[in-house]
Amino acid sequence: MRQTEILLLLGVFVVGLFVVYWLKKHRHARHNQALAAQLKRYPSVRKAWLAAGAKREAVLLVPGLKKATAAVATTATAKAETRLYKHADQCQAMTPQGLAVSEDYLFLSAYCSQQEHHSQLYIIERTSGRHLKTVVLPKRPHVGGLVFDRATQVLWLTITGKGMGRVACVSLQTLLEDDSLATSQPIAYQQVIELAGITHSSYLAADSGELVSGTFALKNGGVVANYPLPVLSDSGRKASPRIKPRKRRVTTTKVQSVAFTTEYLLLARSFGPRSAELWVFSKDATVLTRKHALRRIKFPHYLEQIVVEKGQLYCLFESGAWAYRQKGGSIDEVVVLDLATLLQ
């Protein structure tokens, strides 16, 4: 190949790289502009979002919101349609619920609001925002909370229980090697554990080596409890199938999630199209109700799980889901806030 042709090909390659970079930067800027407009009604949140800008990773879009996503059917009707049209089933009603963060990945959980498909986990690369894979979960749990335990490299998630809370876990290695979407065979949990002291596990968090799980209640308040983090030994011996709470606390209504800093307990309170709130409590508060909150911060509606990560607050919303999108103000990405700015 002549030198002129080599230089021409090299020039085309460089131009191509520039175009890809420009398109990515333009798309990022467009998302930022849209989100900035959404946050105008929430000055504290907007200020914290802008403060996180220099540290912000790629746009962390939630899969399956603006278009249908591949899914595995659970109902006879949906399965029949899959066979009839001879293609992988598609779900337009996946609704995001849980969020967890590891060094390299974001984990998002979602359930089908039409109750036709298995619940799912999405694994997203933190640095690029790329959706790496979808993991199919057994049955149709709400999966309202996730926790990633970095010490054991295990993901914990809430699942449907019978009269008490229930959580399950899967190792990171198993998740990364999973092919459940291709095979239509849901992933198998490594362990399922019942949480005594609460009627169901609506949300999940971790603090100081403990799992923290609580119940969502619409009218009469709920309960949140701390549990010793189950130890899963390398020998294959499973943890106790049921654990008792170390302590329990009464909560306000409409609690979607909790998270912890060294000083504070943060409580996400949200239900329906009205603005959500983040309530700030002393970490040792024994009652988590309005009069005990140190501060209440107005947030966009449909706030779900919040996660504290290295001075930032990761926030997941379900407003971009098909069931709520028409109500306006949808947020399609994980919003990252500077925590010090938010709490100042």
Regions found by a protein language model. Give the residues of each.
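Blade-loop segments of beta-propeller domains
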Residues: 129-152
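Loop/turn-rich, solvent-exposed surfaces of beta-rich toroidal or solenoidal domains
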Residues: 247-283
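A short beta-strand motif characteristic of beta-propeller blades
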Residues: 79-90, 130-136, 188-195, 239-249, ...
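Repeated scaffold domains used in trafficking and secretory/extracellular systems
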Residues: 93-98, 140-147, 194-206, 250-257, ...
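Beta-strand-rich domains and repeat architectures in extracellular enzymes and scaffolds
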Residues: 84-117
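Short coil/turn segments that connect the beta-strands within blades of beta-propeller domains
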Residues: 103-104, 151-153, 208-210, 262-264, ...
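Structural motif
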Residues: 116-122, 163-172, 219-229, 273-282, ...
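Sequence/structural signature of beta-propeller modules
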Residues: 4-9, 13-86, 335-344
